[in-house]
Regions:
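An N-terminal hydrophobic leader/cap segment in hydrolases
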Residues: 1-55, 202-209
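The serine-hydrolase catalytic nucleophile loop
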Residues: 70-83
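Catalytic nucleophile-loop/oxyanion-hole region of alpha/beta-hydrolase
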Residues: 74-76, 101-138, 304-308
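Conserved alpha/beta-hydrolase
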Residues: 82-105
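Short alpha-helix in the alpha/beta-hydrolase fold that links the catalytic acid
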Residues: 255, 269-278
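Catalytic active-site module of serine/aspartate enzymes centered on a nucleophile-bearing elbow/loop
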Residues: 291-321
Length: 321
C-alpha cells in the first residue's frame, strides 16, 4: 500500500498540478495559459504541439521556440521549463519531433534531421502567422541535448530569423563515453543500409547517465511516451552525421547564445561546448559550465541546482528583452 501511495505521489509531481483536479487547473493556478494541438507539416506529418503563454494580463516580452532531446517529449518533465518561462513573461512553443511523444512516426526513428529542421521552421512560421502581435517581439531558440544541435542547424538554415539561442548541454558531438567503439560503428553502418529501423545499437541507459537524483530517475522512467528501447540503426547514423556536420560548422554560428553544460556530463561533451564558444562568430556569447552537474540540468539535478540554471536562463533573457 505504501509503495502504491509513493508511486501515486511521484506521478502527481510529474504532471505538475499537485492536488488540483486537472492539468488546466494547475496552469490557471500558475497564472499562465496553455494549449495543445496537432500541426500538419509540409510533408503531411502530424506533429503534436504545445504552447505555454503568460496570462492575458501580462503581454509576452519574447517568444521562445523550444526543441526537446532524443527519446524525450514535450509533455512530461520537459514542460517544467516553459511553465516557468511563461510565468516570467515569455510565450513558449514546442512540438514533439518526428517519432517522439505523440507525433507521427516510428518511435525514436529519425531518418533525416534535415526534414526535422523543415518541420520546426514550418511550425514556427505558422505560429508567427497566426499571432501577428508576436512579429516584433524578440524570438529565441531553446534546445536540450539533440535539440541544441537542431537549434544550431535551424540558425544555420535561417540565420536572420532569431535573436538568440539557449543551448542546454547541446549535442554538437556525441561523447566518446557513449559512442560505440570500433568495429561496432563500421558494422552497424553496413547493417543500417538493409535494416535502418532495427533497434540494436549497444548503448548505456541515457536516463541513468543523465539524471543525478535517484527519485527523479523514477519520475523520468514513468513517462509513458519515453522510448526505452535501444537506439535504432538509422537514427544513430543520422545523429553521427549531423553532429559531425555541426562540429564542422561551429565557426559559422553567428547569433547571440547562452550555453549551459554540466562538467560531469557523459552524454554530450562539455569540451565541445567550450569549442563552440571559442569558435563561433557571435559577439554576444556566454558559456556556463556547472561543476559536478550531469546532463539533465533542468530536471535531473537537485532542486537547488535546477533553480540556479533557471535563474541563469532568465537573467540572460531579461538582459535581451
Amino acid at each position: 500500500m505504501e509503495e502504491k501511495q509513493n508511486n501515486k505521489s511521484l506521478q502527481t509531481q510529474l504532471y505538475y498540478w499537485g492536488n488540483t483536479p486537472t492539468e488546466q487547473d494547475y496552469y490557471n493556478l500558475q497564472g499562465i495559459k496553455s494549449t495543445k494541438s496537432f500541426f500538419t507539416s509540409p510533408r503531411n506529418l502530424t506533429l503534436f504541439t504545445r504552447s505555454w503563454l503568460p496570462s492575458a494580463k501580462t503581454p509576452p516580452r519574447g517568444i521562445i521556440f523550444m526543441v526537446h532531446g532524443y527519446g524525450n517529449d514535450i509533455s512530461w518533465t520537459f514542460q517544467a521549463t516553459p511553465i516557468q518561462l511563461a510565468k516570467n513573461g515569455f510565450a513558449c512553443f514546442a512540438l514533439d519531433l518526428e517519432g517522439h511523444g505523440q507525433s507521427q512516426g516510428l518511435k525514436a526513428y529519425v531518418p533525416n534531421v534535415d526534414f526535422v529542421i523543415d518541420d520546426c521552421l514550418s511550425f514556427y512560421n505558422f505560429v508567427l502567422t497566426q499571432n501577428p502581435e508576436f512579429q516584433d517581439l524578440p524570438k529565441f531558440l531553446y534546445g536540450e541535448s539533440m535539440g541544441g544541435a537542431i537549434c544550431l542547424l535551424i540558425h544555420l538554415k535561417s540565420p536572420s530569423m532569431f535573436n538568440g539561442a539557449i543551448l542546454i548541454a547541446p549535442m554538437c558531438k556525441i561523447s566518446d563515453k557513449v559512442r560505440p567503439r570500433w568495429p561496432i560503428p563500421q558494422f552497424l553502418t553496413i547493417l543500417a543500409k538493409f535494416a535502418p529501423t532495427l533497434a540494436i545499437v549497444p548503448t548505456a541507459d541515457l536516463l541513468d547517465k543523465s539524471v543525478k537524483v535517484p527519485e527523479k530517475k523514477i519520475i523520468g522512467g514513468m513517462n509513458p511516451n519515453r522510448y526505452v528501447g535501444k537506439p535504432r540503426l538509422g537514427t544513430v547514423l543520422e545523429l553521427l552525421r549531423v553532429t559531425d556536420y555541426v562540429s564542422s560548422k561551429l565557426c559559422d554560428v553567428n547569433l547571440p547564445f547562452l550555453i549551459l553544460h554540466g562538467s560531469a556530463d557523459v552524454v554530450t561533451d562539455p569540451e565541445v561546448s567550450r569549442e563552440l564558444y571559442q569558435l563561433a562568430k557571435s559577439k554576444d556569447k556566454t558559456l556556463k559550465i556547472y561543476e559536478g552537474m550531469m546532463h539533465s540540468l533542468l530536471f535531473g539535478e537537485t532542486d537547488e541546482n535546477v533553480e540556479i540554471v533557471r535563474s541563469d536562463i532568465l537573467a540572460w533573457l531579461n538582459d535581451r528583452c
